[in-house]
Regions:
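Flavin-dependent oxidoreductase catalytic cores
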Residues: 1-176
Length: 176
């Protein structure tokens, strides 16, 4: 029934050694937007266990969504050295590594200190879950965010990641 599970697969230029993957999820193991040794150890343990692809948790990349210091931030060059080290450590076990870019838009509850954040979305309609009223994004900001996606993807490539995933579901910015 699972005859392809341990077979390699190609995703664009990346060759994934098997069909077992670790999806992106918030670990809160980052600090001040950068990769920590704890985050590297967390992913290396999964790579040692035989995971074929790790998609590193959602990374912020634009100032309109930077509200939690435990989030990784691909909007700054400081992300590159830690991601390189993470990717190198996982590759030692044959695991490919992608990074996920993430902008919540209006789908935000509160900041780490419990205050309501200043958030932006295409309109001032609040999110159904969190009910925080966003500010409508000015047209210039829309173009800045688009440009920031591209710049962040370049940083992930400079960090030797094998691919980039853009989170476009769950009511986050692109889905708004």
């Amino acid at each position: 029934m699972y005859e392809n599970l341990l077979e390699p697969i190609e995703l664009g230029p990346a060759r994934i050694p098997n069909r077992i993957f670790n999806p992106p999820h918030g670990t809160t193991l980052g600090s001040e937007g950068v990769v920590t040794d704890n985050l590297i150890a967390y992913h290396e343990a999964r790579a040692r266990g035989g995971v074929g692809l790790i998609i590193v948790e959602g990374m912020a990349f634009h100032p309109s969504f930077e509200f939690e210091s435990a989030y990784l931030n691909a909007g700054r060059d400081t992300i590159i050295p830690g991601l390189k080290k993470l990717a190198r450590g996982c590759r030692e076990h044959g695991t490919s590594v992608f990074g996920q870019l993430f902008h919540a838009g209006r789908a935000v509850r509160y900041t780490h200190d419990g205050s309501k954040p200043l958030i932006y979305s295409p309109s001032d309609i609040p999110d159904d879950r969190y009910r925080v009223v966003p500010r409508p994004m000015p047209n210039e900001m829309v173009w800045e965010v688009i440009d920031s996606y591209a710049k962040a993807a370049v940083r992930l490539a400079e960090a030797d990641l094998d691919g980039v995933e853009i989170l476009a579901s769950m009511g986050y910015l692109i889905a708004q």
